[in-house]
From Swiss-Prot:
Mg(2+) 1 binds at E134, H247, E335. It comes from Lactobacillus delbrueckii subsp. bulgaricus. GO terms for cellular component: cytoplasm; membrane. It is found in: Cytoplasm. The record marks R63 as: Important for inhibition by glutamine. This is Glutamine synthetase.
Amino acid sequence: MSKVITEEEIRKDVEEKNVRFLRLAFTDINGTLKNLEVPVSQLDDVLGNQTRFDGSSIDGFVRLEESDMVLYPDLATWLVLAWTTVEEGTIGRLVCSVHNVDGTPFEGDPRNNLKKVIAEMEEMGFSDFEIGFEAEFFLFKEGKNGEETTKVSDHSSYFDMASEDEGAKCRREIVETLEKLGFRVEAAHHEVGDGQQEIDFRFDNALATADKLQTFKMVVKTIARKYHLHASFMAKPVEGLAGNGMHTNMSLLKDGKNAFYDKDGQYNLSTTALTFLNGILEHARAITCVANPTVNSYKRLIPGFEAPVYISWASRNRSPMVRIPNANEVGTRLEMRSTDPTANPYLLLSACLKAGLTGIKEGKLPMAPVTSNLFEMTDDERKELGIKPLPSTLHNAIKAFKEDEVVKSAFSEHIVDSFLELKETEWALYTQSVSEWEVKRYFNY
């Protein structure tokens, strides 16, 4: 579904829209969007894959002694940032993959990694891995000096009628900006938590959707600042409020048709869908390390706030990890509900696709779907059904990741080593940190 854009079209845009700078975007191993901005006079070098940068200071990239890297722009990602004006000069943006100086794809680049797993999918006869993200975020008020706070922008709740506060106005402008950038926005509404929002955009192939998520986050944060608000995609920014989730909708295409659909199957699911689902469930604990990659992620994965805690699946029931939404042939999909928006989208989709394809190869069907509320079951009832919990801490998720050869095989050795080093360091720093809760509870011992 992604459109094809030529060099000629980009050059025409540059001329007609008075583009003065080019922003070259790429993503580090943590999922953080990075940018190199160059004057438009460098357009020939940019389009000729000649833009170099120092990768030694980027998390998960290279050491100082081998720091030179090259940015290869994906022309299909070209856009002109909607908040820049022709009169003052606009900024063009291209998403890039990272290459070594000899022209080979850099194995530590998360985007290159996803392309490699997609190639494996194509070798199995599938044409597309279609993804739809539902990323939630909070809007917080700025402090007097522009500092970040955790004071929510409003006290509304799920689907509440938008009041004319700054949060509602901000959300509307985010939607308008996304549409100017070519997004097909399908819905925008207030979420469960105070100050919490959700904006859903149309699904696309995996690479395009991962690129769009990074653009989406940039737009949300940029527009929020105009309203003196801070946008946060942190999994659990406020104790006692719902956390930010990122439901991840997945389907495979084959010969232009949805390979997950079978009108005679249970919930209209094909054998391909069921075996893919089994791959996700069997490797769920390891996938969690990339789907919920921060210490804070596990403050969201607790009973009582709708986020799933148990490895299971269902149709209408929203308590399991994977749900099958009621949909037509085109919309038949798996909805993974455990993910949060701190996940690196390229690594997340690499892990999910690899696990699902492995499930298809193995041909095993998943456990029976769960019809009861998992949170109301006893431990014995869940055990009898073979339902296991997701990891409860980043430490447990790291352990599961290390032990899962299938999920590790979704990534280059460079990414596995770099990711584990970063996550183990993060956990070690957390265990050494003394929280306000601890001080209040134990200070007078």
